[in-house]
């Protein structure tokens, strides 16, 4: 299951579809690409509920779709990483889909925006702290509905029992520190974590698909999926 980024309010763009196809080919898996309702029209919890409903549908229909329930993972980039992590949390909480893995690429994890990187990168390219603040204002304009951990996974008081995670953070990204903190919190809760702290990159760097670093990191993500599906 893949949930695209875009600040919860931008619909998916072509390069993310291309990467999803690469993950499918490289990891020899089916990728279900979810088109959730975006926060410009429907704030939290609607985008999250759409993603969780899609996950439930795939789980329920796995036999018809010829999918192995033992090898269902969630993944996403940026805001999509938030949605993936939140789906993993709710699946654990409700005893729903038994996920084998979560792929979190420069994820948004914390609505408090108090980290050092959030203070440092206020005007960085493609994404920065000011845009991040506007994103949260839009996404949570109706509040968190008593489910803060599903809006911002770092607010969960219990991260135990979650599936293994690949967490990727970029050096010059306002989200760097909260992504790394989420990885460390998962690890402290007993979750197996592969943290990739990528030097010399910024949020959304892989938009430039032809760059060697983009190719290398897509390959690392694919390898992480391959390993998760073979365990």
Where are these regions (language model features)?
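Alpha/beta-hydrolase superfamily serine-hydrolase fold, recognizing
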Residues: 2-231
């Amino acid at each position: 299951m893949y949930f695209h980024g875009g600040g919860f309010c931008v619909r998916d763009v072509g390069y993310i579809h291309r990467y999803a196809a690469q993950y499918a080919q490289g990891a020899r898996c089916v990728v279900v690409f979810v088109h959730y309702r975006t926060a410009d029209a429907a704030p939290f919890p609607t985008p999250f509920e759409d993603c969780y409903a899609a996950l439930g549908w795939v789980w329920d229909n796995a036999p018809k779709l010829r999918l192995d329930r033992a090898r269902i993972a969630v993944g996403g980039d940026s805001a999509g990483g938030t949605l993936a992590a939140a789906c993993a949390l709710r699946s654990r909480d409700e005893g729903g889909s038994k996920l084998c893995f979560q792929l979190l690429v420069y994820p948004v994890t914390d609505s408090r925006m108090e980290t050092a990187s959030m203070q440092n990168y206020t005007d960085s390219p493609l994404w920065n702290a000011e845009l991040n603040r506007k994103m949260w204002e839009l996404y949570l304009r109706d509040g968190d509905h008593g489910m803060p951990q599903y809006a911002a996974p770092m607010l969960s008081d219990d991260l135990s029992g979650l599936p293994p995670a690949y967490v990727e953070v970029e050096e010059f990204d306002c989200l760097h520190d909260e992504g790394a903190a989420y990885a460390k919190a998962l690890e402290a809760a007993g979750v197996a974590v592969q943290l990739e702290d990528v030097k010399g990159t910024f949020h959304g760097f892989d938009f430039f698909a032809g760059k060697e670093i983009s190719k290398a990191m897509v390959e690392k993500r694919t390898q992480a999926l391959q390993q998760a599906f073979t365990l």
